[in-house]
């Protein structure tokens, strides 16, 4: 039995879960999300309001999808009730970020400013010229947008300059030694 998949999902107050066949819809104070669950897995509501994710058999495919499906539904419940946030930091001389409306404008050492537009359901917030955060209800989308921003100028292993996640440790390399 999957250690993650067998755990029931508690639904906080103010969150409504609707199960329609393989489609699970979660509505909460921050918005609503829809997820289609893979075929052998079933999602049911318990008598006390908890959500149970079950698998029909112990085949390899069912086992692999069991924990995944439970995590996807749990991430939806947490997203519509609390939301997700990913913080990023910018290191380097002259590297900075500026909020222009809902967009972010980066100065990252290129000959031009880099503008990033938020997709639907994502908000950007800046805290000074070197700190920013990506917020939203969809965990996958928040992580993807944060990774795209980090990819604009990945941290340099020699000087540590670039965009990194808050608290991320960059493995530094020693430069070549002169004679």
Swiss-Prot record:
Organism's domain of life? Bacteria
Against PROSITE patterns, the record matches this protein to: RIBOSOMAL_L6_1
Keywords of the record, alphabetical order, are: Ribonucleoprotein, Ribosomal protein, RNA-binding, rRNA-binding
GO BP annotations listed = cytoplasmic translation
Q: List the record's Gene Ontology CC terms alphabetically.
A: cytosolic large ribosomal subunit
The record, for Pfam families, names:
Ribosomal_L6 (PF00347)
UniProt xrefs under InterPro entries: Ribosomal_uL6-like, Ribosomal_uL6-like_a/b-dom_sf, Ribosomal_uL6_a/b-dom, Ribosomal_uL6_bac-type, Ribosomal_uL6_CS
Extract one GO molecular function annotation from the record: rRNA binding
Q: Which family does it belong to?
A: Belongs to the universal ribosomal protein uL6 family.
Subunit structure comment from the entry: Part of the 50S ribosomal subunit.
Q: What does this protein do?
A: This protein binds to the 23S rRNA, and is important in its secondary structure. It is located near the subunit interface in the base of the L7/L12 stalk, and near the tRNA binding site of the peptidyltransferase center.
Which HAMAP family does its entry note? Ribosomal_uL6_B
Question: What PANTHER family would the database entry show?
Answer: 60S/50S RIBOSOMAL PROTEIN L6/L9, LARGE RIBOSOMAL SUBUNIT PROTEIN UL6M
Q: What is this protein called?
A: Large ribosomal subunit protein uL6
Q: What's the source species for this entry? A: Saccharopolyspora erythraea (strain ATCC 11635 / DSM 40517 / JCM 4748 / NBRC 13426 / NCIMB 8594 / NRRL 2338)
